[in-house]
Swiss-Prot record:
Lipid metabolism among keywords: no
Tissue: Expressed by the venom gland (posterior main gland) (at protein level).
One GO CC term on file: extracellular region
Protein name per Swiss-Prot or TrEMBL: Venom protein family 1 protein 1
Amino acid sequence: MKSFIVVLCCLFAITYGQTDLPAIRRNARFQRNLALVALHNQIFGAEGVENGLAKTQEEKVCILNVKEAALEEGNIVLDETVGKIIPEVERLSTSGTEAEIKAFLDKTDYPAYKKSAMNEFKQKIMTWIPAVQGKMAACRK
C-alpha cells in the first residue's frame, strides 16, 4: 500500500506543471524528497526482514553496515538523477540575474526533465536494490 501511495505521489510530482523558477524549485525539492522516501522504504524494508532472520549480534551489525553503505550510495544515485537540477535552481534562486533565469527557463523543459530523471532513478534503484538485499542476506550465515 505504501508503494502505491509513493507511486501516486511520484506521478503527481511528474505531471504538476511549472512555469516559474520558484515553482520549479519547490517541485524539484519535493521530487527529490519523494524519491528519498521510496529509497528509504526499500532499504529499511530489506533491513527489517534480514534483522528478523538474523540470529547473532554479529549478523545484525553486518546488516547495519550494509544498510549504512546502501544509504550513502542511494544518496549519490539521488543526486545524479532527480537531484541533478537542484544546485542550478538554488543558485539561480539566490543569486541569478533576470537574464540567467530567463535563459534557464527558456532552455529547460522541466516537466520532461523530471519525468526522465524519475524514470532513470527508478531504473537504477530497481536494479540496485536486489544487490543490497543480497548483501544483507549474505550477512546471515
